[in-house]
Design a protein with these regions (language model features):
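Alpha-helix C-cap/termination motif
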Residues: 55-56, 106
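A short, acidic, amphipathic alpha-helical segment used as a generic capping/interface helix at domain edges
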Residues: 45-55
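Short amphipathic alpha-helical segments and helix-helix/interface helices
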Residues: 50, 77-78, 100
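Mid-chain, well-packed structural core segment of small domains
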Residues: 58-91
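Short acidic loop-to-helix transition motifs that present clustered carboxylates
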Residues: 93-98
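Generic secondary-structure microfeatures
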Residues: 26-32, 57, 65-67
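Non-catalytic interface/targeting segments
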Residues: 1-46, 102-118
């Protein structure tokens, strides 16, 4: 696992991680940034949209729902996470990136998906 990842800033449509600017939605899996994250149903995150995260078996999943918070997790995903003992934290991206940083630097097994726009 990478131990030095740091989300430095977020503004609508842009996230800076370790000095690199990302302008499309991203996932962070075991400390590795996966850029160009697209979901099958746009603002709805379902199990198929995060298979790579689920395979990494995180204890916590942080979802950044965008600036106004339009992105949501599906009921099927919420049930799956609960049944598999994975804590889900859904927040507007402006708060979620800070939550991720705090948990990651505490040594938690945390992964994330961030919607960078609406």
């Amino acid at each position: 696992m990478i131990t030095h990842i740091m989300i430095e800033q977020y503004s609508f449509g842009n996230m800076v991680i370790n000095g690199v600017s990302y302008r499309n939605d991203i996932k962070i899996i075991q400390g590795k940034v996966v850029s160009e994250w697209w979901r099958k149903r746009g603002h709805l995150v379902d199990i198929d949209d995060i298979q790579d995260i689920l395979k990494s078996k995180p204890n916590i999943l942080v979802l950044g729902k965008g600036s106004p918070g339009q992105m949501k997790s599906s009921e099927a995903l919420r049930k799956f996470l609960k049944n598999n003992g994975i804590e889900l934290i859904e927040e507007k991206t402006s708060h979620a990136f800070k939550t991720f940083n705090r948990l990651f630097h505490k040594g938690e097994n945390v992964s994330a998906g961030f919607h960078l726009s609406c």
